[in-house]
């Protein structure tokens, strides 16, 4: 029996995935988590074999949660399940140790296939994302996303800024001082050659970091 933990900040998504997997032979959803922080706690308590991890969540987010989870539980397999198809998200998650990366538009059969493959020690990447990653390797470096210049923490804070979260809110969620958050903000602006939150938001939309229709 493959033990699965579902991590997503949207209750409807977690419930939907859990219900879809309920009737699949050989799979058991042992729990749900609504944040990266809770996923670490649930992983310790429930000892899942596979974690279905959302990428964009409040708090530490799926990227950092994956890195921390695998540092403490290297035998767990993480499959990112997200709307983020554009790089640098797939590359970042795979570099962090995720064994799989698939979109939320995937069907039940694909999700079950991904879970079983990573449990068996293989990798799974949705075909459209695998194609993008393959094509990227043939592109000149100049065409790569400027967000590749940012660290994992900088990307996390950049997305929180784009999401209109105030410095104090970011400080509270990440357990950082406001001064440290402002330092990160300065570094982000410097690396991306921008000077305002509006420019950051536009750049994030242009490079697929956020959904323009959201």
Swiss-Prot record:
Tell me the function of this protein: Required for production of extracellular enzymes and fluorescent siderophores.
Q: Which residues bind DNA?
A: 167-186
Native species:
Pseudomonas viridiflava
> Which is one GO molecular function term here?
DNA binding
PROSITE patterns (alphabetical): HTH_LUXR_1, HTH_LUXR_2, RESPONSE_REGULATORY
Keywords annotated in UniProt:
Activator, DNA-binding, Phosphoprotein, Transcription, Transcription regulation, Two-component regulatory system
Q: Which residues form the Response regulatory domain?
A: 3-119
Superkingdom of origin organism: Bacteria
Biological process GO terms, please? phosphorelay signal transduction system; regulation of DNA-templated transcription
Q: Modified residue 4-aspartylphosphate is at which positions?
A: 54
**Domain HTH luxR-type spans what residues?**
143-208
UniProt protein name: Response regulator GacA
Q: Which SMART domains match?
A: HTH_LUXR (SM00421), REC (SM00448)
């Amino acid at each position: 029996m493959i033990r699965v933990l579902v991590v997503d900040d949207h209750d409807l998504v977690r419930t939907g995935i859990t219900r879809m997997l309920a009737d699949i032979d050989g799979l058991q959803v042992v729990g749900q988590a609504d944040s990266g922080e809770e996923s670490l706690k649930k992983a310790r308590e429930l000892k899942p074999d596979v974690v279905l991890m959302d990428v964009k969540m409040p708090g530490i987010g799926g990227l950092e949660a994956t890195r921390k989870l695998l540092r403490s539980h290297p035998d767990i397999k993480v499959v990112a399940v997200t709307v983020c198809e554009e790089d640098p998200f797939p590359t970042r998650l795979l570099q962090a140790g995720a064994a799989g990366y698939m979109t939320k538009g995937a069907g039940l059969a694909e999700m079950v296939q991904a879970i079983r493959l990573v449990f068996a020690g293989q990798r799974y990447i949705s075909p459209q994302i695998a194609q993008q990653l393959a094509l990227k390797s043939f592109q000149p470096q100049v065409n790569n996303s400027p967000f590749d210049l940012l660290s994992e923490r900088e990307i996390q804070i950049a997305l929180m800024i784009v999401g209109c979260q105030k410095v104090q809110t970011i400080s509270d969620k990440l357990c950082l001082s406001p001064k440290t958050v402002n330092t990160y903000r300065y570094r982000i602006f410097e690396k991306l050659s921008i000077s305002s939150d509006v420019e950051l938001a536009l750049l994030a939309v242009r490079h697929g970091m956020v959904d323009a229709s959201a």
